[in-house]
Curated annotation (Swiss-Prot):
Residues 178-305 form the NB-ARC domain. SMART domains: LIM (SM00132). Keywords: LIM domain, Metal-binding, Zinc. It comes from Arabidopsis thaliana. This is Protein DA1-related 5. InterPro entries: DA1-like, DA1-like_dom, NB-ARC, P-loop_NTPase, Powdery_mildew-R_dom, Znf_LIM. The keyword DNA repair does not apply. It comes from the Eukaryota. Residues 630-649 are annotated as: Disordered. CDD domains: LIM_DA1 (cd09396). Residues 1-155 form the RPW8 domain.
Length: 702
């Protein structure tokens, strides 16, 4: 269907068009908008999650006027989404200003969808619950709470976990340990155990539920068999029977689900909960979302033949290989295998089982003695050498081997070497001039056996930095987060201007190097326009024939006419480095937009470096996966803080954490006479007073 027809259909939503069908059409068109990824995909993903929920609500409101119903706000937001998708599909590639504006509008629409789910929908549900309780003869929520206060034991009988076999299956030892580790991770709320039919999914989670560590962590463990055709009303009926209430008929599955959610919230007061949903089919993904409620110490474990990537991390239970099958058969014949308690530990090197009495403990990780080897000589590192051994991102070394080991060419007998001041990697001096690629982001040289990526302008990028290298679309959320960051510092930037990623040739044409002595590569430029006017610097005198002579004029920039037109940043850099550079240039923009021109060069560059350093510090404490505000309608409705995740996908890696420290170290140890001296001077001023007082002092020292 053409996008114009979709927009027309959306506009007629209030006239009776099926809401779920409108959702699907807008979703289909949003996925086709390529110029606004990943925001358009986030919008489509949000609407896909809303379809099953609001389809049920719409059915319940049949015969009512949608224009005055509870879905009015949703319908209006849907109209905005349809219009915006229509506009985005027609935008030209060169319309940078419109693209930035539309990006923010898409983000606002997405937030409005979430706000409806997180606030208004919750109030609607609460009202429906009160109405339902009155129909059952319950006076108030407190009456219901009294009935639920002592049902913890009865409910555990209803959802009792089957007793495990006395003999522990040999092939479940490792999966049991790995699944328990995944479930216990902080921040993990849901885990999906996925495997083909008859591979032992239910057996595995049954063992897990009876594990001593799991029982200690979760005070209440409930096991629900979902199957292909789940009966939500039946579950609700059984719950009512166990609290002594009459099992009234529900109007529909939605009423039953609302009751189950309320019951889980009440049970949450009795302690931590592990809810196991066994044998969930692909058609019931919407049912899983309904069990996602905000409770402390509440986790969900799902078994399925399918994967639910939007629901949570997946644990893949793998089939046995031939050797394991033979071993399993022999053990089952004996039926004398002891229980898995305590579990075996895994070697940090070969990732196989290791006994405590036959292992070496290195910083809390057990190793086979033969697996803890030197990267240079391939010989084991003895126990008495552990205290002096060297361990870094390239491997583990004997101290004597490390002092002679080149991490580039693997030469084991270097007579002289260079060492990187931050990464502490030693290499032959010849690699500085023999054409060995150096990453333009982290400055590490390319080791033999790896392959750095070469950008179109000749720069090199290592594999780690390349994973989070940003393109223009991915920079837009970072740009808006940066504006929020400045606003949080009471330095709001009112003017809208685009952020553009460009090649290095364009940047070097736009701006000369400030530190010519140090040959700094220009990585960004704040473009601005300044009104130049001529003013009289000295009064004229009258000469012969009454002619005016000696009238001197000089050009003068009119500050209040200054405009920032764009920020240009070198393309191909990872998110952390791009963000630091953007913070630096945004400070230049703030100064110019507020009329602060012709400042002391060292102090101006210094305050810009301080802002970049402050932003990097905010990233040091950022939590992983903060881009999940569109992943679930049950998440918090507050705006995502400026401290976002390091990578494009939102996951923090060990390298991301190290790269933050590297960028901060680059600023702190810079020896250039402008950037380096400027940072240290201004940073000391901020430390001794405040950011706002430092700004006043810089403006005073024009």
């Amino acid at each position: 269907m053409p996008i114009s027809d979709v927009a027309s259909l959306v506009g007629g939503a209030a006239l009776g068009a099926p809401l779920s069908e409108i959702f699907k059409l807008v979703i289909e068109e949003a996925k086709k908008v390529k110029d606004f990824k990943p925001l358009s995909q986030d919008l489509a993903s949000t609407m896909e999650r809303l379809v099953p929920i609001f389809n049920e609500i719409d059915m319940m409101q049949q015969g009512s006027n949608r224009g005055t119903s509870e879905l009015k706000v949703l319908t209006e937001t849907m109209e905005r989404a349809g219009e915006m998708v229509h506009k985005c599909s027609r935008i030209q590639w060169y319309s940078i200003a419109k693209k930035a504006l539309y990006t923010r509008e898409i983000k606002a629409i997405n937030q409005d969808f979430l706000k409806f789910c997180q606030i208004e929908l919750q109030l609607i549900q609460h009202r429906n619950q009160l109405q339902y309780m009155r129909s059952m003869g319950m006076a108030s929520v407190s009456t219901k709470a009294d009935l639920l206060s002592d049902i913890g034991n009865e409910f555990s009988k209803l959802c009792l976990v089957a007793q495990p076999e006395v003999v522990t299956k040999f092939w479940l030892k490792r999966p049991l340990m790995e699944l328990k580790k995944m479930l216990f991770e902080d921040g993990v709320v849901t885990v999906v155990v996925s495997a083909p039919y008859a591979l032992g999914k239910t057996t595995l989670v049954t063992k897990l539920c009876h594990d001593a560590d799991v029982k200690e962590k979760f005070k209440q463990i409930f096991f629900i068999s979902v199957s292909k055709f789940p009966n939500v009303r039946l579950i609700g009926h059984k719950l009512l029977e166990h609290i002594g209430c009459k099992a009234n008929e529900y109007e529909n599955d939605l009423d039953a689900m609302l009751y189950i959610q309320q019951l889980l919230k009440q049970l949450g007061r009795n302690g931590s909960i592990l809810l196991v949903l066994d044998d969930v089919w692909a058609e019931e993904e919407s049912l899983l979302q309904k069990f996602l409620i905000q409770l402390p110490d509440y986790k969900i474990l799902v078994t399925s033949r399918f994967e639910f990537t939007s629901f949570g991390p997946t644990f893949h239970l793998k089939p046995l290989i031939d050797d394991e099958v033979e071993c399993r058969d022999e053990i089952e014949e004996n039926e004398k295998l002891p229980e898995v308690n305590p579990p075996l530990s895994m070697c940090g090197g070969c990732n196989s089982a290791v006994k405590h009495e036959e292992s070496v403990n290195i910083l809390g990780v057990l190793w086979h003695p033969g697996c803890f080897c030197c990267r240079s000589c391939d010989k084991p590192i003895a126990i008495h050498e552990l205290e002096n051994h060297v361990s870094n991102s390239r491997g583990k070394f004997h101290k004597s081997c490390y002092e002679r080991y080149c991490y580039v060419c693997k030469e084991k007998k270097m007579k002289t070497y260079n060492i990187h001041p931050f990464w502490e990697e030693r290499y032959c001096p010849v690699h500085e001039a023999d054409g060995t690629p150096k990453c333009c982001s982290c400055e590490r040289l390319e080791p033999r056996g790896t392959k750095y990526g070469k950008l179109s302008d000749g720069r090199w990028l290592c594999l780690e930095c390349g994973k989070s290298a940003m393109d223009s679309d991915e920079c837009q959320p970072l740009y808006f987060d940066m504006r929020d960051f400045f606003e949080s510092l009471n330095m709001k930037i009112e003017k809208e201007f685009p952020l553009i990623l460009v090649r290095k040739e364009l940047l070097n044409k736009k701006e000369e190097k400030i530190d010519n002595h140090y040959e700094v590569l220009i990585r960004a430029y704040c473009m601005s326009e300044q009104k130049i006017m001529t003013y009289v610097s000295e009064e004229p005198r009258t000469g012969q024939n009454k002619q005016l002579i000696d009238m001197d004029t000089e050009p003068q920039g009119v500050v209040h006419e200054c405009k920032v037109t764009a920020i240009l940043i070198l393309y191909g850099l990872p998110r952390l480095l791009t963000g630091y550079i953007l913070a630096h240039e945004m400070m230049h923009a703030w100064l110019r937009l507020n009329g602060h021109m012709n400042l002391n060069n060292i102090l101006e560059e210094g305050i810009c470096q301080v802002l970049g350093h402050l932003w990097l510090e905010s990233q040091t404490y950022a939590t992983a996966d903060t881009t999940a505000d569109a992943a679930s309608a049950s998440s918090s409705s507050s705006r995502t803080p400026p401290a976002a995740s390091a990578s494009k996908k939102g996951e923090w890696s060990d390298f991301d954490k190290k790269l933050v420290e590297f960028c901060k170290n680059q600023i702190e140890t810079d020896e250039s006479p402008v950037y380096g001296l400027g940072f240290r001077t201004v940073n000391e001023m901020v430390t001794n007073s405040s950011l706002q007082e430092t700004l006043k002092e810089i403006l005073r020292r024009r």
